[in-house]
Design a protein with these regions (language model features):
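Internal "kinase-insert"/substrate-recognition segments embedded within catalytic cores
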Residues: 235, 240-241, 256-257, 277-282, ...
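Middle-to-C-terminal accessory/interaction subdomains
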Residues: 177, 188-190, 211-215, 221-223, ...
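Disordered, acidic Ser/Thr/Pro-rich linker "stalks" and the adjacent N-terminal cap
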Residues: 20-75, 88-95, 121, 163-167
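Trp- and acidic/polar-enriched beta-sheet ligand-binding modules for extracellular glycan
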Residues: 64-68, 91-164
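A short beta-strand element within beta-rich, extracytoplasmic domains
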Residues: 79-91, 144
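Conserved oxyanion/phosphate-binding beta-strand-loop segments in alpha/beta enzyme cores
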Residues: 202-256
């Protein structure tokens, strides 16, 4: 509400300023130019000055195809209020401006550049196009960054504004989502998971939140690094707490969601994890990502899975912790099919590959490595031993049952064929228990894997239905889940508790709808950049042709999957219609998915965001007091 009011005032002020603002002049600057007649770098034709000569028949074109730009040094900071552009006069020109980004900066290397505008339509040759800019920061340098593979090829640019240092009271976003802006030294594109590229990273929220710091950037992930839309890991120079994230930390991840055309499967799984009451659920927020001025798409800014009081909250080991109770923890590891590609890893006695995440590979001591390998093998021996079902000496002795089984249920509800391909676990200091979690990696979950599609047509659990597993994990889970007669009772109890805590199709479908609305502008930009809605990517079983169809199927899947799980676990769900006898009824969930009210009349609600169901109709409500 406050931000909407501010925008109305800002727009009114901006419209008054336009009458006074004129076209700005400055020193043209840009990437090296190309001479198309020779294919070589040019210092005589297609120069940056050609984009500011008032002649729509001339043009600027860069030698390199991507991450190239042309702009002005204005001499002093100016608040930019309007921008104009015209595409190169040739057969390809109109399309070359689409997804170009207008940026402003106060460093001549543009390391502190922020996006002012993104062009979303083709241009018209021989015609100037204009857009109003709403940004309170004054910038000395302005530039047009051409879209990928376009060589800029711009006929004319014009910037309007007035001299002022401005302030940061309003910084624009491209779609209504927060933005992560990465500028790397010399515009080097991150190219592998090993080499950290010197960077400057800014995170701009929709309510004025702002983070800026030196950082390094590299690729992250495994199979996802092969996609054209790359995933990234950011490491800030100092600990940062961006947006509404709980953790203050240096390391953050940008998940690319290339094969997930809803762009929200991971976020949905995180929400389900919260409904199950997992000790820690990773933070996730949909964001737009800009790399060196180029729009990269809709991503999710997420926690790095690491030891932190607001992430995996265990003691952080020192290299002096080599004996006694200090040697017992904390440890964080990943059962990992790719473990043999890592430095700090082991293969268990029953062929389960494990990557040790904490202590770090360059800090862990021989004593610590031996301790956690021995402890894992002891737990595994209980699972595969003759007394595995014994309440005292069986698998429960060293493996925490509740977190392992909740992790299992989240994997099954989501239909995640990769549940046991990668499993995070941790051990606390002074405790003889291994805890499972957090949940992670759901790009191919929710019926997005051709190997198991359609999941709901199968009679058995998805982990037994052609999914992938690291080493011998499938047999490990079989022994815990199927061979111990007491386990199923425990699974039913945990499922029932989650169902009573708000895990139902009404809430989850309403949550999906609210996310789709929040991400609508961003998803349009994303699929403008990555034209894949009509093609099968990664493990897609079906190409549904539109974002709306992808979201609709996600809701259809979750509705049927909850019904499937109820039947499989023989759980009878009591709906609100069964407990409210009046002709009208309300059910209210809070932002975490917890039912806070159900009854015949709507109560007065405290400030916050709620999902309200009234006689079967669901809406999202914001109470702002």
């Amino acid at each position: 509400m406050k931000k909407t009011f501010f925008l109305i005032i800002l727009m009114a002020i901006t419209s008054m300023v336009f009458a006074e603002d004129s076209v700005l002049t400055g020193q043209p600057m840009g990437s090296p130019s190309v001479d198309y007649s020779t294919g070589a770098v040019s210092i005589t034709v297609n120069q940056p000055s050609s984009a500011f000569d008032g002649d729509l028949s001339t043009f600027y074109a860069s030698y390199d195809r991507s991450y190239t730009w042309v702009g002005l040094d204005l001499g002093k900071p100016h608040v930019i209020t309007r921008v104009g552009w015209s595409p190169r006069n040739d057969g390809v020109g109109p399309d070359r401006v689409k997804l170009a980004v207008i940026e402003g900066a106060n460093r001549n290397d543009f390391m502190d550049a922020i996006p002012l505008y993104i062009i979303t339509d083709n241009g018209v040759i021989g015609q100037m196009h204009y857009a109003d800019i709403l940004c309170s920061r004054g910038v000395r340098y302005v530039r047009y960054v051409g879209p990928n593979n376009a060589r800029c090829n711009i006929a004319e640019l014009a910037f309007f504004g007035h001299e002022s240092a401005g302030d940061d009271s309003y910084l624009p976003t491209l779609s209504g989502l927060p933005m992560v802006i990465i500028q790397t030294k010399d515009a080097v594109e991150p190219y592998d998971k090993v080499n950290d590229i010197e960077s400057y990273v800014q995170i701009i929220g929709i309510d004025g939140e702002y983070v800026i710091d030196s950082a390094t950037t590299r690729l992250r992930g495994n199979a996802s690094t092969q996609f054209p839309k790359k995933p990234y890991r950011i490491k800030f120079e100092s600990k940062q707490k961006p947006l509404d994230a709980p953790a203050k930390a240096k390391k953050w991840t940008l998940i690319n969601n290339y094969g997930d055309k809803t762009l929200m499967r991971n976020l949905l799984a995180f929400r389900i994890s919260q409904l199950f009451g997992m000790p820690y659920t990773p933070y996730g927020q949909a964001v737009d990502v800009i790399l060196n001025g180029e729009y990269k798409g809709c991503y999710q800014l997420c926690d790095q899975i690491e030891v932190n009081k607001n992430r995996v909250n265990i003691d952080e080991m020192e290299n002096t912790d080599t004996s006694g109770e200090n040697l017992t923890g904390g440890y964080l590891w990943e059962i990992d099919a790719y473990a043999n590609e890592e430095v700090s890893w082991f293969n268990s006695k029953n062929n389960i590959p494990v990557t040790i995440k904490s202590p770090d590979e360059d800090e862990i001591t021989r004593e610590q490595s031996k301790y956690i390998e021995d402890f894992f093998n002891a737990m595994e021996a209980d699972v595969f031993g003759s007394q595995y079902a014994d309440a005292v000496n069986g698998w429960r002795r060293l493996l925490d049952a509740e977190t392992f089984l909740k992790h299992f249920l989240i994997g099954e509800l989501s239909g995640n064929t990769d549940t046991y391909w990668s499993v995070y676990q941790y051990k606390k200091r002074g405790e003889n228990k291994i805890y499972t979690g957090p949940v992670w990696d759901f790009d191919i979950a929710f019926d997005n894997d051709y190997r198991t599609y359609p999941v709901n047509n199968k009679s058995d659990f998805v982990y037994r239905s052609g999914g992938s597993s690291a080493g011998n994990m499938k047999s490990f889970v079989d022994r815990v889940l199927l061979l111990d007669p007491n386990t199923l009772t425990e699974v039913k109890r945990l499922w029932g508790e989650a169902r009573e805590n708000g895990l139902n199709e009404e809430y989850l479908c309403a949550w999906i709808d609210s996310m789709a609305i929040e991400m609508d502008r961003s998803q349009q930009l994303n699929f403008m950049r990555w034209n894949i809605l009509n093609s099968k990517e990664h493990m897609n079983p079906v190409a549904r042709g539109s974002y709306a169809s992808e979201v609709a199927y996600l809701k259809e899947y979750i509705t049927k999957r909850i019904e499937w799980m109820d039947k499989k676990l023989r759980y009878v769900y009591t709906s609100v219609e069964d407990v409210v006898s009046s002709d009208t009824y309300y059910r209210v969930w809070d932002i975490l998915g917890r039912i806070i009210y159900q009854g015949a009349s709507l109560p007065v609600l405290d400030q916050g965001i709620y999902v309200i169901m009234h006689n079967g109709t669901i809406k999202t409500s914001v109470v702002d007091k």
